[in-house]
Curated annotation (Swiss-Prot):
Keyword flag Oxidoreductase: yes
GO function terms (MF aspect): peroxidase activity; phospholipid-hydroperoxide glutathione peroxidase activity
Catalysed conversion reaction: a hydroperoxy polyunsaturated fatty acid + 2 glutathione = a hydroxy polyunsaturated fatty acid + glutathione disulfide + H2O
Superkingdom assignment: Eukaryota
GO cellular component annotations of the record: cytosol
Name the UniProt record assigns to this protein: Probable phospholipid hydroperoxide glutathione peroxidase
CDD domains: GSH_Peroxidase
Cell location: Cytoplasm
Active site: C43
Species: Nicotiana tabacum
Any GO BP annotation: response to oxidative stress
Induction comment from the UniProt entry of this chain: By fungal elicitor.
Family: Belongs to the glutathione peroxidase family.
Amino acid sequence: MASQSSKPQSIYDFTVKDAKGNDVDLSIYKGKVLIIVNVASQCGLTNSNYTDMTEIYKKYKDQGLEILAFPCNQFGGQEPGSIEEIQNMVCTRFKAEYPIFDKVDVNGDNAAPLYKFLKSSKGGFFGDSIKWNFSKFLVDKEGNVVDRYSPTTTPASMEKDIKKLLGVA
């Protein structure tokens, strides 16, 4: 975790909790292109996003893409289950092989520090708050937030930007 005296410079300055409650230092993802996304199991966007994320992950994981999924119950109560139930659904139904982290808040006073950083890095058109499930942030190999995508932007439509950051034609 970034110390109180220094402002985080990249996502590598953060530690988050995995689905089992263990600390994960995001610096382990140095050199990877990341999609960081807040997810929900009971949203109208669930099927299309998880299906697309699984496909894009399979296609580019060997070139250095990683998807970091953070369950969030702040939008319509659409992620009410336990982290075990969420992980089971995602891994069974959508064959997700990317990490599912512990449930977080993405807005408000209790927002995860990582999400405060993501939003401050790429606010702009979207404002400072996450609007809905499946808001996506694209992070380069140096841990810089390079783009933010709306919930209705499919991971497949991000492919051109992902390929550019991965350096693949």
